[in-house]
């Protein structure tokens, strides 16, 4: 699932994923968090 968060590194996805899914995990793919 891609979320609308721009990123350059996976670290930027952690807070956003935690907010949306309650799990602090994420990858940065094509400039967006997954």
From Swiss-Prot:
It comes from the Eukaryota. It is found in: Secreted. This is Potassium channel toxin alpha-KTx 2.6. InterPro entries: Scorpion_toxin-like_sf, Scorpion_toxinS_K_inh. The lineage of its organism: Eukaryota, Metazoa, Ecdysozoa, Arthropoda, Chelicerata. The keyword Secreted applies. It holds the Pfam family Toxin_2. The record marks 27 as: Basic residue of the functional dyad. GO terms for cellular component: extracellular region. Belongs to the short scorpion toxin superfamily. Potassium channel inhibitor family. Alpha-KTx 02 subfamily. Has the structural arrangement of an alpha-helix connected to a beta-sheet by disulfide bonds (CSalpha/beta). Expressed by the venom gland. Keywords: Ion channel impairing toxin, Neurotoxin, Potassium channel impairing toxin, Secreted, Toxin, Voltage-gated potassium channel impairing toxin. Its main location: secreted. The keyword Cell inner membrane does not apply. Potent inhibitor of Kv1/KCNA voltage-gated potassium channels.
């Amino acid at each position: 699932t891609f979320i609308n968060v721009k990123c350059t590194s996976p670290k930027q996805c952690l807070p956003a994923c935690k907010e949306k899914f309650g799990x602090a995990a994420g990858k940065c793919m094509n400039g967006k968090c997954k």
